[in-house]
Design a protein with these regions (language model features):
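A short alpha-helical element within helix-turn-helix/winged-helix DNA-binding domains
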Residues: 28-34
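Short alpha-helical segments that sit at the start of domains
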Residues: 1-13
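Basic amphipathic alpha-helical segments that dock to polyanions
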Residues: 44-49
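Minor-groove-contacting beta-hairpin "wing" of winged helix-turn-helix DNA-binding domains
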Residues: 60-67
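Non-DNA-binding regulatory cores of transcription-related proteins
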Residues: 67-131
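Short helix-capping/hinge SLiMs at alpha-helix to coil transitions
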Residues: 18-22, 68-69
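Glycine-centered, phosphate/nucleic-acid-interacting loop/turn motifs that mediate DNA/RNA or nucleotide
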Residues: 52
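Key DNA-contact positions within bacterial/archaeal DNA-binding proteins
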Residues: 39
């Protein structure tokens, strides 16, 4: 399984903000500290603010800070809002009905079980557990 850079960046930003509660950081500061482009940071901030994980304000005195309690930020829930596609293989897509092995393939259910186990395990953790 491969998680997108976008998901990675969301986790990194939340971990950093979680380790610095009540501090406000600009996009440029986060970019410099985390080694990420400002464009990527802006996209992540938009998504996190839209889902009420962080406070974000623009302007001269603007910046971002964590507003949710780290104990209330479930990692699986975060994964669900950041990953557009958790399909392990192409034919998990709703556009593709089945494997070409015509009923002989039992891979899809096995991989689906593995994905569900991954998500279930991740749901046991919060941001507080990883900061």
């Amino acid at each position: 399984m491969y998680l997108s850079k976008f998901t990675d960046y969301n986790f990194r930003i939340l971990i950093y903000l979680g380790n610095h509660p009540n501090e406000i950081f600009t996009v440029d500061e986060l970019s410099s500290i985390l080694g990420l482009s400002t464009n990527h940071i802006k996209k992540v901030i938009y998504k996190l603010a839209k889902n009420n994980y962080i406070y974000s304000s623009k302007g001269r005195n603007g910046g971002v800070k964590l507003i949710m309690n780290p104990k209330d930020i479930n990692l699986e829930a975060l994964l669900e809002i950041t990953e557009d596609n958790l399909n392990i293989v192409e034919y998990f897509s709703s556009d593709i009905i089945s494997c070409n092995l015509n009923g002989e393939c039992k891979l899809k259910p096995a991989l689906n079980d593995a994905l569900n186990s991954f998500k279930l395990k991740l749901s046991e953790y919060t941001l507080a557990d990883i900061i």
